[in-house]
């Protein structure tokens, strides 16, 4: 337990209202920083904090802590700013006569940035810009900066992606040294390399990906022999071309992962590699790292071999085509791929076995709608729920099997390695989830200090097909901790497995590339004591960096998706949609539409009654008419307005009579404990 005299180092997370939080590595909760104790800290600063004792806390928060509603020692004061986290800020410029302000895109930054006229760099009002901070402000003065890049008009959809990329400091263009390094990369496989590898070109080999995918980094072989399924997962040997500490390798580490931003991809590796020599294109000899598994009729992986190999893909398949065969039995598709139909049927058979094996041990399979966003000529033309077909699951099952097999192999060899780990959820969050889902008649078992993933699996099974399936699945997912990379093999809670790593996507993930390098050195007998010491020294930092870069990419993907949804709904203001209440707080109601777009209904716009938020029922309840809006309720809403600056969509609820509530007057909000 941390004492109030102990100083801790962490990252400051600001809030528009002036207060903030500090996240400290190794502590599973954030420290609340009152507005009068931030010491001028700016969002993302590295700070030194001192936990407060009860006597230093504001009365209401002190009482809440005594009652157990907040964690002990969860409040602190900033004692020192160690390092400024943000050097630049992205936002929209508003020009006055002799100066201007930039309204930050990041809603956590609690003040606009003052721009002296001489530093506007040709920006016009309404331009989205990048500002270099020259002063971080204080209690009386705003932060100050100078404009170093004009991205474009904030209403232009083409500026959306670039603004998010600049805000999160995601590398966009490849530096010159990387371009120069590409000159050594061949267009075809060197025939001399083939002699040293296991030749698998005679096996019928397929890739299965989305229609638009170009970076094909995994291929599958499968056949039966001596009562065993012979499953081969073949992964592009990226490490053969991206050598350690080369410019390509350093830039790949810097990026950490490819970033998929709706209709644009920011790749981890240049196209010459990702779409060229490393992509497992049909009819081309390709260097691979293969995990060859023998699976019995009960779905047990009884033996395996990991080897450097060469393959030649027979057919580049799509999820749509494979599903048309194994699910729809579409005559035309089956005729076209008649020679491969038995292979796909066998794949489905083995996939079902592997999936059932995971289900028996308690692996959690979340099934909620993801968004499919179609962009045509720079504008969003369609948003809807992404249809997940059985063929997606086939590839997922095979990749999981390879990842687990590789991780277990290297764990028992006691070699330095990068694992993918997922810790059990926090007991308090599990308790809160249990209370929430009980309102919908669902329950799951959890002891005070322990919960098994199988209980979550049972919950997901119990809500399958129900109207609240999508919503409860999301609530359950939010209860989980984030998976991360680690040198310690501590298991994966969500998959209910002891050993796990990321092996199958080295074109788009650096951790996969990292362990390919280790595996190949081990296969070749070059992983001697010195090399093991080398990896033991560098892997902890690389794991931490990979985890941070993954979170950065996920943030970018979320932000761009928000922007595209706002852009799309701005064309539908005034239109009526069906939705489900996905969240409630004292400010209003969140509603998710059938097309996966989420918007907000402010309690101030609910004129038919005086509404109070009930914490006990997670509902907004009318005081006079007894109207009640709870999570999971179906509602009809009208799109009231959208705002690209705040990335927000506002709805108003249509009343039961088919009319939206009207009228004016003072709205009263209250808490019902």
Label the model's feature ranges.
Residues 130, 135-137, 163-166, 170, ...:
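Electropositive polyanion-binding surfaces
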Residues 29-34, 109-115, 597-614, 665:
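A short macromolecule-binding patch
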